[in-house]
Swiss-Prot record:
Protein name: Uncharacterized protein MG007
UniProt cross-references to NCBIfam families, sorted A to Z: PRK05818.1 (NF004488)
Cross-referenced Pfam families: DNA_pol3_delta2 (PF13177)
InterPro entries noted in UniProt: P-loop_NTPase
GO biological process: DNA-templated DNA replication
Length: 254
């Protein structure tokens, strides 16, 4: 088990499974028995999302400069409380604004011993080197077991797009099926007009990051050199927001 640290950066690879790692790491921080027993009150509060001193930030609840200031006040007020462990968890810190990451740096540097920062990223190359130098790092590799069953072909597709945590969400919210519909339309040369139109209706609502994932997977699955070249060019121009109709036409054309 990883030793708890003042600031931990979790680097997620495709096919990795964050939740069980987080459960183990968080319980090891707060456990009354000092061993992550998962039976004491603190451990159970973590596992049931009821631990009051866990501050969680994600894309829906993004971390901002004012959050850093608020947490600093809380941590300073409770810095002498040895038994109370304050934890702040920020997902995908590579997406933070420059103001937010600078505020986070100060929080990491000034936080008392009873506070723990946990950060996740899917692309550590986008993170400031000054931040990377102040955190311990752990890389989550592809999980050997997943908590659901899909066909072998679907598993190949889904692990190309998502971490295991995202896979669970993708299956539950239907986004995996939307990816499959578009993939079938793009990879099958005999796709009918109705199927292509249905795929287009889904594709036009995709974000650029989803489109990039889709193009990358099609590049990996096609053996047509000309098709690969066209798709590589699509990836290059994607940051400039080309018309989605043009991108889709390149995906389905042979």
């Amino acid at each position: 088990m990883l030793t708890t640290t003042h600031a931990l950066l979790i680097i997620q690879r495709k096919g990795s499974f964050l939740k069980p790692f987080l459960d183990n790491y968080l319980t090891s921080i707060v456990c009354e028995n000092k061993n992550g027993c998962k039976k004491c009150i603190n451990c159970l509060e973590i596992l049931n999302n009821k631990y009051n001193s866990l501050y969680w930030f994600d894309q829906i609840n993004p971390f901002k400069r004012e959050n850093a200031l608020q947490l600093a006040r809380i941590f300073n007020r409770e810095r002498t409380s040895v038994n109370n462990k304050n934890i702040y968890l920020i997902e995908e810190i590579e997406k933070l604004s420059s103001n937010s990451i600078n505020s986070l740096l100060r929080l990491v540097e000034d936080s008392p011993i009873n506070s723990y920062g946990i950060f996740t990223t899917k692309n550590e190359s986008l993170i400031l080197s000054t931040f990377l130098s102040r955190v311990q790092k752990v890389v989550l590799k592809k999980a050997s077991k997943v908590p659901f069953k899909v066909s072998k072909n679907d598993q190949e597709i889904i692990t190309s797009f998502f971490t295991v945590d995202e896979q669970i969400e993708a299956i539950e919210n239907g986004s995996f099926n939307r990816f499959k519909i578009i993939l079938d339309a793009c990879l099958n040369k005999k796709t009918g007009t109705e199927q292509i139109y249905h795929a287009w209706q889904i594709f036009r609502d995709f974000s650029n990051s989803e489109i990039a994932q889709l193009i990358t997977l099609i590049i990996n699955k096609t053996e047509n050199i000309d098709k690969k070249s066209i798709l590589f060019n699509c990836l290059k121009v994607l940051p400039y927001n080309p018309p989605k109709s043009t991108l889709f036409a390149n995906l389905v054309s042979w």
